[in-house]
Swiss-Prot record:
Main location: secreted
GO cellular component annotations of the record: extracellular region
Secreted listed as a keyword: yes
Tissue expression from the record: Expressed by the venom duct.
Compartment annotation: Secreted
Protein name as it appears in the record: Conotoxin Cal6.36
Coiled-coil intervals, chain numbering: none
Entry remark concerning the domains of this protein: The cysteine framework is VI/VII (C-C-CC-C-C). The presence of a 'disulfide through disulfide knot' structurally defines this protein as a knottin.
Molecular functions (GO terms): toxin activity
Keywords: Disulfide bond, Knottin, Neurotoxin, Secreted, Signal, Toxin
Role: Probable neurotoxin.
Length: 52
């Protein structure tokens, strides 16, 4: 039971991590949905800096 929880958590962290750090122009990135005219690079930092 405990192993399943840990695995689920790991998958969640990886998925969110990929979305956050993905290229802004990538449809899978978090920023793509928040702000379609996103610059390339670290979407999360860009969004935080620009208040998106």
């Amino acid at each position: 039971m405990k192993v399943t929880c840990v695995l689920t958590l790991a998958v969640l962290i990886l998925t969110v991590g990929q979305m956050v750090t993905a290229d802004c122009r990538s449809p899978g990135s978090w920023c793509f949905y928040k702000h379609s005219n996103c610059c390339s690079g670290n979407c999360f930092l860009w969004c935080v800096q620009n208040g998106k």
